[in-house]
Amino acid sequence: MDENKQKALAAALGQIEKQFGKGSIMRLGDNRAMDVETISTGSLSLDIALGAGGLPMGRIVEIFGPESSGKTTLTLELIAAAQREGKTCAFIDAEHALDPVYAKKLGVNIDQLLVSQPDTGEQALEICDALARSGAVDVIVVDSVAALTPKAEIEGEMGDSHMGLQARMLSQAMRKLTGNLKQSNCMCIFINQIRMKIGVMFGNPETTTGGNALKFYASVRLDIRRTGAIKEGDEVVGNETRIKVVKNKIAAPFKEANTQIMYGQGFNREGELIDLGVKCKLIEKSGAWYSYNGDKIGQGKANACKYLKENVDVAKVLDTKLREMLLSPANINDESAELVEEMPEQEEF
């Protein structure tokens, strides 16, 4: 660059930093914090599919899917993981349906969890913005976008038309929230529901509520679906679940994770460790027997899972090794995602 231009640029940068504060403008390569801080989702296969080891701090995340597909369970698992790291979490329960007993079963410290049950959509989003601006909250969950009812709709008559009111409310909130979340390094997760577009003959008729603003502002969008039931005899004890990363600004999108959600327990972490361990050749499978470091850990997957549940230290070491293999910068490529996508349909217990 020309010397005069360099001097002019240096003067301009100095003026900007003086006026707006240090770090308000920088060269992209200067900031080593381009490695985005993440929080584990509680599912190893989903962390790998996301490509960064979890969901990113300081960003907006959208999780959507049909009813009873595991959306709230996923957010509660993430809250539990964040609390174990000493982070402060808040749950804005617009649906007024949060079950503290279930949250506690998933490992959430309910004594430390901030909960709000707002009356209107505007109130919910104002609370969300205030928590983000405080700089003291690390994770905010809004459950759900569909339940964020504008004040005008609540105060109006049952048959009144309020065209685009919720979409306008959310669009304004996204503009305000994005910068505040980034400055305070706070993650905001919006749970959303699915609706059907009437008259769509070709393509996917499904859409999410609340207009298009959330789709644009979200750094990560997860589509979670129940694909089957897990049975013990005739009793259903959990769901086979597929989670697709439909948008990802921190790594490559369109990866999928297949996992299990057990009723009252959350993600079947041990089952994921065994499946990925076999794929990465850390666990040997010979017939029905599973072996780790030369020692047999169980006959059949259910017994191997039981061994890992009882031996937490072994499970932690295995988890760390798998993360190093599949998430280290040198090894992040399509292969790690393929391992997750190709995971076998997990056996019934």
Swiss-Prot record:
What family does the entry list? Belongs to the RecA family.
Keyword DNA-binding set for record: yes
Biological role stated in the UniProt entry: Can catalyze the hydrolysis of ATP in the presence of single-stranded DNA, the ATP-dependent uptake of single-stranded DNA by duplex DNA, and the ATP-dependent hybridization of homologous single-stranded DNAs. It interacts with LexA causing its activation and leading to its autocatalytic cleavage.
Q: Tell me one Pfam family matched here.
A: RecA
Q: What is this protein called?
A: Protein RecA
SMART domains, A to Z:
AAA (SM00382)
Q: Where along this sequence does the record place binding of ATP?
A: 65-72
Record keywords: Cytoplasm included? yes
NCBIfam families given in the database record: tigrfam_recA (TIGR02012)
A Gene Ontology biological process in which this protein takes part is: DNA repair
Q: Which InterPro entries match?
A: AAA+_ATPase, DNA_recomb/repair_RecA, DNA_recomb/repair_RecA_CS, P-loop_NTPase, RecA-like_C, RecA-like_N, RecA_ATP-bd, RecA_C_sf
Matches recorded under CDD domains? RecA
Single GO molecular function: ATP hydrolysis activity
Q: What are the GO cellular component annotations?
A: cytosol
Q: Which keywords does this chain's UniProt record carry? A: ATP-binding, Cytoplasm, DNA damage, DNA recombination, DNA repair, DNA-binding, Nucleotide-binding, SOS response
Please state where this protein is localized.
Cytoplasm
